[in-house]
Amino acid sequence: MRYDPGLIEEKWQKFWENEQVFKAEEDETKTKYYVLDMFPYPSGAGLHVGHLIGYTATDIVARYKRAQGFSVLHPMGWDSFGLPAEQYAIRTGTHPRETTEKNIANFKKQLTAMGFSYDESREFATSDPEYYKWTQKLFLILYEKGLAYMADMAVNYCPELGTVLSNEEIENGFSVDGGYPVERRMLRQWVLRITAFADQLLEGLDELDWPESVKQLQKNWIGKSSGASVNFATEHGVIEVFTTRPDTLIGVSFLALAPEHPLVDLLTSDEQKAVVAQYIKETQSKSERDRISEMKTKSGVFTGSYAKHPVTHKLIPIWIADYVLIGFGSGAVMGVPAHDERDLLFAEQFNLPVVSVLNKEGVCINSCCEGFHLDGLSGEEAKQYVINFLEENHLGAAKIAYKLRDWLFSRQRYWGEPIPIIHFEDGSCRPLRDYELPLLPPEIQDYRPEGVGQGPLAKVREWVQVFDTETQRAGKRETHTMPQWAGSCWYYLRFCDAHNSAAPWAKEKEQYWMPVDLYIGGAEHAVLHLLYARFWHQVFYEAGIVSTPEPFKKLVNQGLVLATSYRIPGKGYIYPEIAKEENGKWVAPSGEELDVRQEKMSKSKLNGVDPQILIDEFGADAVRMYAMFSGPLDKNKLWSNQGVAGCRRFLNRFYEMVSSDRVKEDNNFEGLSLAHKLVQRVTDAIEKLSLNTIPSSFMEFINDFVKLAVYPKSAVEMAVRALAPIAPHISEELWVLLGNSPGVQKSGWPSVLPEYLEGQTVTIVVQVNGKLRARLDIMKDASKEEVLALARESASKYLEGCEVKKAIFVPARLVNFVV
């Protein structure tokens, strides 16, 4: 019989849908298992095979756990708010909702074709009003707890896009979307007080089964450090500086303020106002990432003012420097160029003094003055001495600081969740009540922003201006929207109870499913999404509305999928199919030599592979199999369509083996042993997520199994059941072909018996006077007499003419003839 995936795959996909095979149930008699993908943004480009690595891995685990008898939740949804759909709307006038729905339909078609076992009854998009009603409600929980507030913030603002951007949405001073210039501006924004949970976010990492690299990234992002705050007096107020090295205080030769520091205007002398204003303007065109990058030179400008050193009382020049950020510490740095590389670069750039106050061993030197004797001290002892001095003289105090800053939550966009707040003229505001949610955005024709810092919602006067019946006052709706992160902060909780119209989730369902047992997604989300989701979850835990302190028990980052790209230097990428190899070099149709690389699959590099093309040619099961075979789940891997073809050839052989007339009711030990060993290897591989080893295990199995004269039917059935998580369509077809009822998953995961793993034979080492002379494969239950006779025969040429004084016999291991 011939294997034809085109005939069987759609048939079994319809069977799964009609039978609701993957519908999750809260069954208290079963152990639950919640396996989740980081859900995708439904872009117009659709999926390429790079996206499928993680999706295939979670699907294998979900199918395996169902077969083991777990109650499995394996859902899929859409992170559907975001800037790309809005930019497309600006260019074309097409409503973002229409674009999003079209893209989702395409994504669903692609995922269905791969045979993924999602519980489609729980599907939703973050742009569904039924969903973002609860996003708005959860935001209001943060607001009511004082964790959401408005403040004037230095932000990355893109005039062309008309919105604030996160650092991750900027590259080399330009927006990732569209490549438009970005500048720094002070704007009134909504902010979430994530810093209030800094310690909980740090401590919670210790309990998580996550990659150490991800945990370290989050620790670095939070950036907890202990030190001291030091007060430097000026004519216009006190400059508070945070330092982790109070023991170097005597070595301060300048202060550097962030350009956004509130004292800059007051401290700038009349003579310096013009150059300071110009410097601040230039700084506004730089992102924070650019400002703190490791440059060989540092930029800055003198304010014309001085501060008094708290110990020596010397006058210290006050500079403005863009490498100082307003959000960390106090937005001011004490420059100790002798003992800080950045400070030294700055001092050398502007010819400032360099005063050494530590010797090579880290012992304080040159650090004594009246009432202050630091010389000879080092390390924590020296730091504590300075802190005690500062506290006793009311010049500072011990302090813990964090790099983590409160989360800028506003976006000046249309396609995002409206923030459910009404503002009044006196500066007060009112959160909307539950019955007023969801707050829907108005239908508009022009999606462009309304002036600096105002999103397109601000244009719709009849929507913005309201009479609030609760307070009997005229008010204005908030015109900022939430960032795309908002919907992804809690979607995993909504999957527990996706269509609850009375609450974001029912308590008993959250208690049943949470936490997520396995979460797989890209390493690019290591900090922001994962940190923001943990923050919201810990707020909910403190509020008593979730039962676990952490949302994601185990995290795995899949590696990147690389593919060959072809680029004309200085011009751009070309499609691989038009590149030609001539005389050992790759050239474009124009004859220009190409730069050939292995790079991450992407639309921009023209090296993405449409999975549907591969499915049409080789079948979904072959694509799934190669997606795992291509390399370890967490490592980068190079994609090869030839590899998919190889997996298709294996499936052809497997189909032929199962459909062979050699399959019979038989208890052939060797055949059963091969099947049991296969199942054990597949089980171990799935448990350890070493999924790349599974295809080779099957290939080794079939190479040995087809040598048998008879294929024991029970062994064949075991192999089919073991293949089902990886290649589900062919497994379903073959399961029925073997005479079973449809639904291979219902048959359970095959049990492995130890006696078949050990085999019927053992290898005996035969020695003469301790030297290896032969090996024997003999039956395990062979008697001592049989073993000795066979051993003597195998070593006969070494025993000829010799007297055997003793035969040492170690059962199942060796025979040693002493002659």
UniProtKB/Swiss-Prot annotation:
Residues reported to bind ATP: 603
InterPro entries on file: aa-tRNA-synth_I_CS, Leu-tRNA-ligase, Leu_tRNA-synth_edit, M/V/L/I-tRNA-synth_anticd-bd, Methionyl/Leucyl_tRNA_Synth, Rossmann-like_a/b/a_fold, tRNAsynth_Ia_anticodon-bd, Val/Leu/Ile-tRNA-synth_edit
Primary location: cytoplasm
Localization in the cell: Cytoplasm
EC assignment: 6.1.1.4
GO molecular function: aminoacyl-tRNA deacylase activity; ATP binding; leucine-tRNA ligase activity
UniProt key word Nucleotide-binding: yes
Span(s) of short sequence motif 'HIGH' region: 40-51
Entry-linked Gene3D superfamilies: HUPs, Isoleucyl-tRNA Synthetase, Domain 1
GO cellular component, one term: cytosol
Keywords, in A-Z order: Aminoacyl-tRNA synthetase, ATP-binding, Cytoplasm, Ligase, Nucleotide-binding, Protein biosynthesis
One GO biological process term: leucyl-tRNA aminoacylation
Keyword Zinc: no
Placement of sequence motif 'KMSKS' region: 600-604
Pfam families: Anticodon_1, tRNA-synt_1_2, tRNA-synt_1g
Reactions it catalyzes: tRNA(Leu) + L-leucine + ATP = L-leucyl-tRNA(Leu) + AMP + diphosphate
Family: Belongs to the class-I aminoacyl-tRNA synthetase family.
HAMAP family noted in UniProt: Leu_tRNA_synth_B (MF_00049_B)
Annotated protein name in UniProt: Leucine--tRNA ligase
Source organism (scientific name): Chlamydia trachomatis serovar D (strain ATCC VR-885 / DSM 19411 / UW-3/Cx)
Highest classification ranks of the organism: Bacteria, Pseudomonadati, Chlamydiota, Chlamydiia, Chlamydiales
Gene that this sequence comes from: leuS
